[in-house]
Amino acid sequence: MAKNEITIENVEGDVNFGKSPEENVASIINIIIGDIVSCAVKIDRIDRTFPSKISNKIDHNNLRQKRIIIQEYKSYSSQIEKAYIIADEQVINGKEIAMSMLNNMYFKALDKFDIDIFDIDMTKIKKHADEIVDDIIKQLRKFIYKSANINSLYKEQVEIGINVVVAHAFVECLILENPNASN
């Protein structure tokens, strides 16, 4: 009879041999994404301009490659506030909880680039802005796919929803720095 033996020497991430307990818990963000992607939108791929307030923030943080998610957000901007209202109806303080989680993801991303959240170094922010946003997207993606209420969405919807939610957090100054609040 064959003997199955596994030797694990160094583990640097999550290891689950079955369904993780956190996968049995629903996510507020999934409610928001589900509502965002369920609406009909007209996507304007020609207009690549941004309102001046958003353009100032993009320039202030030196955001380059990830500007595309802000462009995508423009098509869904009216729907996202409705989605947060629906989240608040289903979960007490749903919007605030989701916003707090996104802000905490930003702080985790800053830590990866050795940026002190209490003494923001704008030189480092400008150098790593796209990477910081990318890290937040990765954190959010991992979080979403580990939650119980993801099953009713298509992967493409989830990916668009992630970009829209992260872009909204950028516009609301939860991620990256507000040009009006810096020294």
Which role fits each region the language model picked out?
Residues 35, 39-183:
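Long, low-complexity, intrinsically disordered terminal regions
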Residues 1-34:
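Long, low-complexity intrinsically disordered regions enriched in small/polar
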